[in-house]
Amino acid sequence: MASDTQQEKLLYSEHQRVPLVWWLFAAGVVAIIAWQAQMGRPMWAFYVALVVSGALAVWALIYFSRTKVEVTEDSSGERWLHVGPARLPASVVNRSLVIPPTAKRAAMGRQLDPAAYVVHKNWIPTMAMLVLDDPDDPTPYWLISTKEPQEVLEQLGRPIY
């Protein structure tokens, strides 16, 4: 696998990290939990609650921030979309479109096909939809949150509608 990644050319990369305000909110929640833990108890209860709840908060925020969106080109010229652990060759994408913030709710609502591959991050306002034409794959389309959907689709090299 290491030799495969060395031969791939990175065309686009995006880390989907949680907003800074989430870290501030988590710090406030950790402080409240620690303060409540020491009420009527020795001071060590404050420190234990601070360390435990702080570690859990940091782990949760890092866990939510782990998704990465990349577009690469392999040595044969095939472009690939990587979203988290999934990989999609551009050759199976029939058409693609940018979903603006105003249409995000509709795209994620009743119209959503249960067989679709969805990577949704609530704090990212825009999405990209890639309709697939692959007889070997039952997935009708990919719906992914991305900060720059136009750039992702342009780098993938497929028609944008």
State the predicted function of each range.
Residues 82-143:
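Non-transmembrane, membrane-adjacent beta-strand/coil modules in membrane-associated proteins
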Residues 76, 135-137, 149:
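Short strand-connecting beta-turns/loops that link adjacent beta-strands
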